[in-house]
Amino acid sequence: MKVRESGMPPPDTWDAYFEPDSILSKLGLTSACHDVVEFGCGYGTFTIPAARRVTGTVFTLDIDEVMIATTRRCAERFDLRNINFKLGDFVTGGTGRPSGSVDYAMLFNIIHHEQPLNLLREAYRNLKAGGSVGIVHWIYDATTPRGPPMDVRPRPEQSLQWAIEAGFTPKSDIIALPPYHYGLVLSRIKK
């Protein structure tokens, strides 16, 4: 199942909306993270910078084989060998990763999914105790150049509430990622 309203513009247009390294830094994805799971690689906008940062592997998933192929070519161009690609529907089938196996989960521009709690619960399941989830989404403003329609676009407070309902604990306030996005960082409390 594809995420509603998730059509992608041309790669250059998409990439112009983000400063990936700055966003990853603000969301706490550092070299202290070993393994990362990314829910939806898209063009690899965040996959490639994440792979350059972490000491382990970025496990990236997407339902669209074109997105997987595009990101794979980009990884090859930069000679990145620490990315594991998986084509599949992680919403209905999960990631296929063992529970508690990654340090960080990336949910970027995907939380408007029809079942955000299921998506967040799968991210929670994947994380080690003490691991973090980074959420990035379009701000709740109809003038943004892209993003899902306003009737399905979550406000930051709604995304935060869903994450708390899924079991996460906030690590920070809502993070401004101008000009078009906001971010959240939450953790799976150690048990």
Summary of predicted features, one role per range:
Residues 103-116:
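A short SAM/SAH-binding and catalytic strip from SAM-dependent methyltransferases
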Residues 118-132:
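A short glycine-rich, Lys/Arg-flanked "PGG" loop and its adjoining helix->strand segment in the class I
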Residues 95-104:
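A short acidic, Gly/Pro-enriched loop at the edge of an enzyme's catalytic core
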Residues 15-34:
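Conserved alpha-helix/loop element of class I SAM-dependent methyltransferases that forms part
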Residues 37, 43-93:
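Class I SAM-dependent methyltransferase SAM/SAH-binding core
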Residues 175-191:
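Core SAM-dependent methyltransferase catalytic element
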Residues 134-158:
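Conserved class I S-adenosyl-L-methionine
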Residues 1-18:
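Class I SAM-dependent methyltransferase Rossmann-like catalytic core
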